[in-house]
């Protein structure tokens, strides 16, 4: 009898208001602006970009990671940046092309393979990509550009960020996305062999 009384009072008339669940963020932005092509005209024709040449030499490279957010949404960094077409693909990966620049992406994850010499910057990566980057613009998006290395904000021109081994760079326009847990690089891979 006591158990029934407890159950009845537990189901009583008091209703609890629940706040609505927060909206789920959209992972990737909509449309082609959030999925830019892997190369511009210079790379398509294997021409020099900022004195960076497309060559068949395959030096060992180190890895850096670059993420781009616009209004809180991910911009897909394509496979094939810095690899002149015709691309040889294996699924989403670009395995090879006519020649390679000192900066390249083989997978659509933001993982950038960087030749150790000369010292290369985020501006060099965007130049090879054929996409604009400044303190007021990234790709086709305009507005104040925030750049982070790891979790620390970088003041000044984002093009000047020097790419170093295992550096994690985040570039944002619009709604702020707090830098999250650092990118975990594959263990034992300080450099990438050709």
Tell me what each language-model feature is.
Residues 1-9:
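Sec-dependent bacterial lipoprotein signal peptides
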Residues 11-194:
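Ubiquitin-like/PB1-type beta-grasp interaction modules and other compact soluble beta-rich domains
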């Amino acid at each position: 009898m006591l158990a029934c009384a407890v159950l009845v009072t537990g189901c009583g008339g008091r209703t609890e208001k629940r706040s609505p669940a927060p909206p789920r963020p959209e992972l990737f932005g909509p449309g082609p602006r959030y999925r830019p092509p892997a190369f511009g005209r210079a790379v398509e024709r294997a021409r020099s970009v900022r004195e960076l040449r497309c060559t068949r030499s395959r030096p060992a490279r180190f890895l850096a990671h670059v993420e781009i957010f616009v209004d809180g949404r991910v911009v897909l960094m394509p496979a094939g940046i810095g690899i002149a077409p015709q691309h040889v693909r294996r699924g989403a990966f670009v395995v090879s092309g006519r020649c390679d620049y000192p900066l390249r992406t083989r997978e659509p994850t933001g993982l950038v393979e960087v030749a150790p010499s000369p010292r290369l910057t985020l501006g060099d990566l965007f130049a090879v990509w054929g996409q604009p980057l400044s303190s007021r613009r990234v790709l086709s998006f305009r507005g104040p550009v925030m750049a982070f290395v790891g979790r620390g904000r970088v003041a000044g021109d984002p093009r000047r960020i020097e790419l170093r081994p295992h550096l994690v760079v985040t570039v944002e326009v619009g709604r702020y996305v707090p830098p999250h847990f650092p990118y975990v690089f594959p263990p034992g891979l300080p450099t990438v062999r050709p």
